[in-house]
Amino acid sequence: LTEGMHGMISQVEGLAKALELDFFHEKIELNSFWKFVPPKFTPIKKFVFKNIIEKDFDVIISCGRKSVIPSIFFKKNSQKRIFNIHIQNPKISLKNFDFVVAPEHDDLKGENVISTKGALHYLTMQEIDENRSYLEGKINKKKDIIILILGGPTKYYKYTKDNIQKIYTSLNENINKKNLQLIVIPSMRTPVETIKLAKEYFGPDHLIIDNVDKKAYLSALSLAKFIVVTCDSSSMISEASLTGKPIYVAQISSSKNDYRFKRFRDLFKELNIIKELNDNLENWSYQSLDETNRVAQEIKKKLS
């Protein structure tokens, strides 16, 4: 159960795959008034949401605020024992769930809480390696590859032309200094103008992917020597950390207090996974981070 956003789908489906479950995905829709009410003030009643699930199920994996009440409702009203797992802080009594999976930077404590370094996701190294050839024919094999993974505007980070140009300028200095080729990978949130500006700025010698393309994303992760991710997406930074390759974070000035994102990035800096994008690229390595499988093993152990 999710609100349908990529970062949430990646987490629930990643955990379902790691638990070796057959699954179906349900995008939760709350009825008008309840969209604006925090879970702790919402009744656990059917009139809160629109979804009707007729398929049989044994486990619920939910992520995001809107899926909290439906998860509890379906568990309580089932004719059989249902295990429910919520990803992220549900901001309601943790006793409503069998497991709550939350990042360390949320600082959530409880007997049924499993803390993670960063976000869960659905990528595997096997899948990344299998898709390497997808972009291989479009790159200059004599050059090392640097990739830029773009997020998109949020209430904390604005994708203004000025903010994006600063990132492109910093990237360009590194590209010229080290004679690199760039691959730009957009996400669902990336504005069209940001991609258009990349094409104008970097020109035909670099590869700018126009649309969301999972195969291109996986291929780029495989081909990259250096990875750059915009600071607005903890999910994409977590996904990139599976590779064990150097990850640089492209900063955007925050328009609101982004302390949770900063805590996440500080943790990843301590783990030697990320550094801030500057004009001097270094090569380093770290222990590949695969929290999805670690969490799945912990859940399996507790369930058995």
Question: Model-predicted segments: where are they?
Answer:
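Conserved catalytic-core segment of nucleotide-activated headgroup transferases in glycan assembly
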Residues: 153-185
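Leloir-type glycosyltransferase catalytic cores
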Residues: 265-304
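A nucleotide-sugar donor-handling region in carbohydrate enzymes
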Residues: 94-160, 277, 283-289, 293
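Catalytic donor nucleotide-activated moiety binding site of glycosyltransferases and closely related
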Residues: 179-213
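Short internal beta-strands
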Residues: 26-27, 101-102, 182-188, 248
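A donor-sugar binding/catalytic signature common to diverse glycosyltransferases
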Residues: 3-8, 217-258
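Short, aromatic/basic amphipathic alpha-helical patches
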Residues: 13-16, 73-75, 99, 193-202, ...
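Active-site and donor-binding regions of nucleotide-sugar-utilizing enzymes
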Residues: 5-121, 128
